[in-house]
Amino acid sequence: MEKLSLILLLAITYYNSYSQTDTLFYANVEEKPRFIECKEVAKTQEIQCFKEQMDKIIREYIKSITSQGTCGFIQGRVNVSFCINPDGTTKVLQMKSTDKDWEAITLRIIESLPPFIPAKQNGKPVVVKMLLPIRFELE
């Protein structure tokens, strides 16, 4: 049986600027977007809970495609930039990788994320941009 090892480098990278359309970067927003599972988590644990939930979703997705025999890749890394909208949905903005197959998998993962509790700034839901580096390793 294949052993799956996925390392999620969730160093949620932040840009340090604002746009004119209430789009903020993760580091700059007052209330961070959250998974439903992180709703009751203390503010000091929000980022850790976010990382754990994202890691869990990515692991489950990779396990599902490797169990179907549809993944013939050994390893890969994708840097994906995406936004979480005020309605909690996600939209991929840009991806960088040397392997288009991993980009396609990453796109499906981000598009299949469950709705988020949206980020808020001054009490209003806002768009939040994030950069997520994902490193896949299959053994």
Map each language-model feature to its residues:
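Short, linear, compositionally biased motifs with a strong N-terminal bias
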Residues: 10-11
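Charge-biased low-complexity segments
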Residues: 5-6, 17-139
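N-terminal hydrophobic targeting signals that begin at the initiator methionine
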Residues: 1-2
